[in-house]
């Protein structure tokens, strides 16, 4: 079975498992785990910040970032299909008392003018003052779309001008960095806080980082305990993340190339794929109104895909465990599954 549902499905490689088995460990809560300490040091440098904190998940990292950047009653601006908005169970409100305002995005992005238009008077006793702006890069629901560097810089500059905190949900930041041909620090370094997930393109079983200034990360360590993210001998997990930073970043270009090959092959076969959308490792396929039937037929042909926020669209995501041969098999199988469910044969 070729599993293209998500890049969260990767399995640790044999070499990563060896690194896990051989990890030096200590009490992470006492800052005595040497492997965690090394990951936090290197992770901060990788993300362009003074300090980083190791956490179990990127969702926890996002929620800690929002908690330390705002206060109850503040307003948070995000693109309306962002992970923070749709897939974190109302966390900004539940955990931090934040009012989340969704901006209408294009390809998962929004403009400085949109930010400025939503800035609320902090002196008013009637409104929630705008305090935080969050960017997601790459953008999951938009299909792995990448923010251009100049747009990132413009958003950060606007936030600085208007004294707004700015957070980067960088769950797939490494995909954006590889697509732009720049270090991750070039994208994430200008934000107040940035998160990175290790269990997607980097192929780890779990783990995430939040990075920022020393002062903010001191607050993040308190947030780590508050959210139940403090661990003990966490070096066995941090070792996987260190291995990934050494061995799995550059190879992400292979995932992107395979996604492009899949999209082009399906387009040649008459399947409705938006080629312009394929910027990283996501391919969005319009299968028509019988999406459930198309997914079932693809499974019968040995290919697993997942749904998206769009009712006629499925996604295929390339990752560490998808080979060139898998892509060619999928190119042969998917058109048969789509046409047999009556989907359109391309735009």
Regions found by a protein language model. Give the residues of each.
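Conserved PLP-enzyme active-site core in the AAT-like
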Residues: 1-288, 292-301, 306-322, 330-347
